[in-house]
Amino acid sequence: MSAEEQEEGGATPAEVIEVVGETGMHGEAMQVKCRIQEGENQGRIIARNVLGPVRVGDVIQLRETAREADSIGGQ
């Protein structure tokens, strides 16, 4: 981990490019597609589940960029 990552607690910024939909038992989480802005996965687009209000253009901090959320309603 670099010195910058240690200062930020290991978080990596990612920009929300699409809100896919609501997920969770009561719709409390949103599934979004986001583009990683820094690090070894820079430029990669991944799906993640996010708690709280989020919209396109927001920058979220991800602790881990290797894991991706399952698609909503996947059978």
From Swiss-Prot:
SUPFAM superfamilies: Nucleic acid-binding proteins (SSF50249). One of its GO terms (cellular component) is cytosolic small ribosomal subunit. Keywords: Ribonucleoprotein, Ribosomal protein. Pfam families: Ribosomal_S28e. GO terms for biological process: maturation of SSU-rRNA; ribosomal small subunit assembly; translation. GO terms for molecular function: structural constituent of ribosome. InterPro entries: NA-bd_OB-fold, Ribosomal_eS28. HAMAP family: Ribosomal_eS28. This is Small ribosomal subunit protein eS28. It comes from Natronomonas pharaonis (strain ATCC 35678 / DSM 2160 / CIP 103997 / JCM 8858 / NBRC 14720 / NCIMB 2260 / Gabara) (Halobacterium pharaonis). The gene is rps28e.
